[in-house]
A protein has these predicted regions:
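Sec-dependent bacterial lipoprotein signal peptides
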Residues: 1-20
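Intrinsically disordered, low-complexity polar regions and short flexible loop motifs
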Residues: 22-430
């Protein structure tokens, strides 16, 4: 037999092997990766991967913008170091090492975190579906809002009579997979072990029969309320937005007791120096009802952004009672071991600009009556001294000693005065 004829079977086999390697569907010897970007601190992300014996960063997913999911990209199966970078930036945000990806598998990386808190979680997208009439659910808590409980109930059920489907999911972690009955539910998310601490209320969410679903809890701009996304296995993202904002009142006026309602919800009933607790109201343009010493004060509607946090400060000048809507940034500090602090000026009886110093170092200056400074990050620690002075004269107004500032906490020093008696109330906002 001629030698060329003996080569035909070998060439045919090689040709078939090469063609199988071109299969876009992730055939034998390949794995599939994709990236979800729900990281408010990073507008666009790239994903790189390299094997243990090759330290060259190879880009596999590019330009995944905030609140989107990429298509799957195909890699040879094996063990990889996976890296995340800002789009177009060479420095690496995070490396997850030694990830083993088997043949014919699918994996989703969920990137999350505010600026300085970038992280990721991995979802394996080849979970066996449950029986008919059942749904598998896994919760990912990427909201930076503490540990959370998740309830799925009928719409009329009180949380006092309900048990979480998934309880105590710590920030930056995912739960085990739970299997529950399929159907329509009301979704509610609360702080862990506190059914009164409502963070999200979705009137209706549908869990399909034999579905495998990831429920991703994400941050809002204020830092405490959360939103939800559903991501079916190998499917697309669906957002369940939070329609609420949180608001509280603060009293700087000395004209008498203040009663305040925002969007029909009572947020304050107190005298000068009082800072109320946060209450949830529907976001949008909301009416304000205000009485001072029993006399109604006209206040225009206030615009609240969904997921936002606010303080409505009442104060007085020569023109009478005034109000200021102040945005509250209750997001975490950008680095571990840090706290955030600001000063709010409600000194109606003095009407002077304020300077706040932490351990004798000024961090805010010239803060006018009815305003608040931006937050400043400081190291956490004990035995701090806080000094508030008149910016114009440097006269001391308040000194607080032996102050503890906790890591990952947010503080407001609210300044008020009753006559010539000045006081400063340090509030822990989160």
């Amino acid at each position: 037999m001629p030698s060329c004829l003996r080569l035909y079977p070998i060439l045919a086999a090689l040709s078939a092997l090469l063609l199988s390697g071109c299969d876009d569907g992730g055939g034998s010897g390949h794995t599939n990766l994709r990236l979800v970007n729900v990281s408010p601190g990073y507008d666009s992300l790239d994903l790189y991967a390299n094997t243990a014996d090759d330290d060259t960063d190879r880009q596999h997913v590019a330009g995944v913008t905030y609140q989107t999911v990429s298509s799957y990209t195909q890699l040879e199966s094996g063990t990889y170091n996976v890296k995340f970078k800002r789009s177009g930036v060479t420095s690496t945000l995070l490396t997850v090492s030694g990830r083993a990806f088997a043949d014919d598998t699918h994996h989703t990386f969920v990137a999350f975190g505010s600026a300085g808190h970038f992280a990721s979680l991995q979802i394996d997208d080849d979970v066996a579906p449950p029986d008919s009439g059942r749904t598998k659910v896994q919760v990912l808590n990427v909201a930076e809002a503490g540990s959370l409980d998740v309830y799925l109930t009928e719409s009329s059920v009180s949380l006092d009579d309900a048990t979480p489907v998934v309880a105590g999911v710590a920030a930056g972690t995912s739960s085990a997979v739970s299997t529950i009955d399929s159907g329509d539910y009301r979704l509610r998310v609360t702080g862990a072990s506190d059914s009164d601490d409502l963070r999200l209320d979705v009137p209706n969410i549908t869990l399909d029969s034999r579905q495998v679903l990831s429920l991703i809890l994400t941050a809002t701009q204020g830092g405490v309320l959360v939103e939800a996304w559903t991501l079916p296995q190998q499917g697309s993202l669906t957002k369940f937005a939070n329609t609420k904002a949180r608001i509280r009142g603060a009293v700087g006026t000395t004209a008498g007791p203040v009663v305040m309602r925002v969007g029909g919800v009572g947020v304050l009933n107190g005298a000068v120096g009082v800072v109320g607790n946060y209450a949830q109201v529907e976001a949008g343009s909301v009416p304000v009802t205000l009485t001072v010493n029993g006399v109604a004060v006209a206040v225009p509607n206030q615009t609240l952004v969904a997921g936002g946090e606010y303080t409505l400060l009442t104060w007085t000048n020569a023109s009478g009672t005034q109000t200021t809507l102040i945005g509250d940034d209750n997001r975490l500090p950008t680095a571990s071991g840090k706290a955030k602090i600001r000063v709010m000026n409600g000194l109606s009886s003095l009407d002077v600009p304020l300077t706040l110093a932490v351990n004798f170092s000024p961090i805010a200056e010239g803060i006018a009556l009815g305003q608040a400074s931006a937050f400043t990050e400081v190291d956490d620690g004990t035995d701090y001294q806080l000094d508030v002075t008149n910016t114009d004269t440097a006269a001391n107004l308040v000194t607080k000693t032996s102050v503890t500032l906790q890591s990952a906490a947010v503080y407001t020093l609210f300044m008020s005065a009753n006559g010539t008696t000045v006081s400063g109330t340090l509030r822990k906002d989160r």
